[in-house]
Amino acid sequence: MAEASATGACGEAMAAAEGSSGPAGLTLGRSFSNYRPFEPQALGLSPSWRLTGFSGMKGUGCKVPQEALLKLLAGLTRPDVRPPLGRGLVGGQEEASQEAGLPAGAGPSPTFPALGIGMDSCVIPLRHGGLSLVQTTDFFYPLVEDPYMMGRIACANVLSDLYAMGITECDNMLMLLSVSQSMSEEEREKVTPLMVKGFRDAAEEGGTAVTGGQTVVNPWIIIGGVATVVCQPNEFIMPDSAVVGDVLVLTKPLGTQVAVNAHQWLDNPERWNKVKMVVSREEVELAYQEAMFNMATLNRTAAGLMHTFNAHAATDITGFGILGHSQNLAKQQRNEVSFVIHNLPIIAKMAAVSKASGRFGLLQGTSAETSGGLLICLPREQAARFCSEIKSSKYGEGHQAWIVGIVEKGNRTARIIDKPRVIEVLPRGATAAVLAPDSSNASSEPSS
């Protein structure tokens, strides 16, 4: 499993990254305004070189389907922490109290919640000091061509599971890296340090550090990691307290998987011919760049604002799509509620591409996302203020939020209405002509 320190191949890759400054010599930080598109020939590689050519799947699209996944992992659930009736508190509060070192019979203790298989992160009460260990792991395959941005996206995706719990600090990260055996030695030496640097830069932006990991050789490139934090109960928000009347807020647009696939189709005439009537090459390039920037943006700001605006529950939107993750979150609720989604903020033109291609299921909410936004249950009176606050320049550029649905009385399910309102989200650098007439109202109430 994970090495204790940055040694071996992982250490060599990180050491090589020390001398690398990212694409075009830039350190992007919280702004992508100075980003220049990746050109493989700048590294001495062929102009036709593609990072995505070293895997057969892309990003979070590699996930095992949710229902099958839960069956596969059923044997890992410990008898003393099995989820009762699909609730979010694992094993009951008394068992959680005993795990935390309290005497048997001490009674329910909301101070020591626990969370296991089925949600974004595990929450394990520690034996000492009323603290909890919150930990998550994630990895996937390349879905963009820029190695540096791929590293940033992978790190942002790992940290996002902590941010979905309202956690803003991470104590430590490990990096998991697989170098493709199909790569030449020259390709490995030039590309791998950029991926490592992107991962490390995103970790540093998140206020943490990569202290070790594991690196192997594999047919496909893989990158991801482990994020760990020890915190007090008031530092995280359990994903189980939505109430009737809450609204659902989404902090990144959908359509990332569609955008990265459409970008690859520019070099595939058979696929491109199916969608070229609904989107131009320029629009695909802009959508791809916007998807890349969004995936590389940390959800840390949204996590902090969850506390400010009294969030009741949240999850991040990744491989199961907005519908799958909404359904999973709904199952965790203590109250008898259901989620109804009315609005779908989507990167401009990607809804049309999804429909024309006959793939993805973007409008049905089943299209995979990678390093997507947080879906947050907020009190109705707080939601519009959240959407306004997150766009403040003090948090840097690129943060957005939309009210996309409501929480109503129900049986812990989630659904998207038959004809959801599509909000076309204008990519940075696009002309106003791409913008749909109603897409500027970021905090509009869902319609029935």
From Swiss-Prot:
Catalysed reaction, written as an equation: hydrogenselenide + ATP + H2O = selenophosphate + AMP + phosphate + 2 H(+)
Cofactor binding note of this UniProt entry: Binds 1 Mg(2+) ion per monomer.
Signal peptide (UniProt feature, chain positions): none
Keywords on record: Acetylation, ATP-binding, Kinase, Magnesium, Metal-binding, Nucleotide-binding, Phosphoprotein, Selenium, Selenocysteine, Transferase, Ubl conjugation
Binding site for Mg(2+): D120, D161, D316
Residues found modified as Phosphoserine: S46, S97
GO CC, any one term: cytoplasm
Gene Ontology terms for molecular function: ATP binding; metal ion binding; selenide, water dikinase activity
Catalytic center residues: U60
Residues annotated as binding ATP: K63, G118, M119, D120, D138, D161, G212, G213, Q214, T215
Modification sites for N-acetylalanine: A2
Maturation and modification: Truncated SEPHS2 proteins produced by failed UGA/Sec decoding are ubiquitinated by the CRL2(KLHDC3) complex, which recognizes the glycine (Gly) at the C-terminus of truncated SEPHS2 proteins.
Top-level taxon of the source organism: Eukaryota
Family classification: Belongs to the selenophosphate synthase 1 family. Class I subfamily.
PANTHER family the UniProt entry points to: SELENIDE, WATER DIKINASE (PTHR10256), SELENIDE, WATER DIKINASE 2 (PTHR10256:SF1)
Subunit-level organization: Homodimer.
Biological role stated in the UniProt entry: Synthesizes selenophosphate from selenide and ATP.
Protein name: Selenide, water dikinase 2
